[in-house]
Swiss-Prot record:
The gene is rpoZ. Belongs to the RNA polymerase subunit omega family. This is DNA-directed RNA polymerase subunit omega. The RNAP catalytic core consists of 2 alpha, 1 beta, 1 beta' and 1 omega subunit. When a sigma factor is associated with the core the holoenzyme is formed, which can initiate transcription. GO terms for molecular function: DNA binding; DNA-directed RNA polymerase activity. Its EC number is 2.7.7.6. Keywords: DNA-directed RNA polymerase, Nucleotidyltransferase, Transcription, Transferase. The keyword tRNA-binding does not apply. It comes from Nitratiruptor sp. (strain SB155-2). SMART domains: RNA_pol_Rpb6.
Length: 70
């Protein structure tokens, strides 16, 4: 699947909130960079951590929760 389609699906999975998606991708990419295992089966040497994070969100492997301020 093309990266544009993956990004569109990931955006849909976070309620079309680009800010939320960018924060989630950055946090997950940081986790992957520090040694966490990817939740999708990909060659980590072939893809960037941000691309893997997008794939995980697009496939619904990561659940993004928004903390509500009181």
């Amino acid at each position: 699947m093309r990266l544009e389609k993956i990004a569109a699906k990931a955006l849909e999975n976070v309620g079309f909130d680009r800010y939320l998606l960018s924060i989630a991708v950055a946090k997950r990419a940081n986790e992957l960079a520090t040694g966490k295992e990817p939740l999708v089966e990909v060659d980590v040497k072939k893809y960037k951590y941000t691309d893997i994070a997008l794939m995980e969100i697009a496939e619904g492997k990561l659940k993004i929760e928004v903390e509500k301020e009181s």
